[in-house]
Amino acid sequence: MHAVVINVSFTDFAAAKAELSGLVPRVSGAPGFVAGYWVALSQDKGTSIVVFDSEDSAQMLVGMVEGAPAMSVTVDSVEVGEVMAHA
């Protein structure tokens, strides 16, 4: 399994929360999706961890993120890594 870790800065926290209702179903419907977590670290920063069954599937999400129009967040970083353990 591979995870996509996305760190963002919120430009509009309330709008970002509202946009999740459309974003989460699109991501969870992606091929190879295993699990996803969207976390508000503060009113200014957030992170998400989305797990896929393969690196290729994870890289597809990276392409979606990089090609997405700016909305209520600024993407600070996107990284893919191998899941070493889970519980």
How should these model regions be labeled?
Residues M1-T47, D53-M64, V73-A87:
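Short S/T/G/P-rich N-terminal loop/turn motif that feeds into the first structured element of a domain
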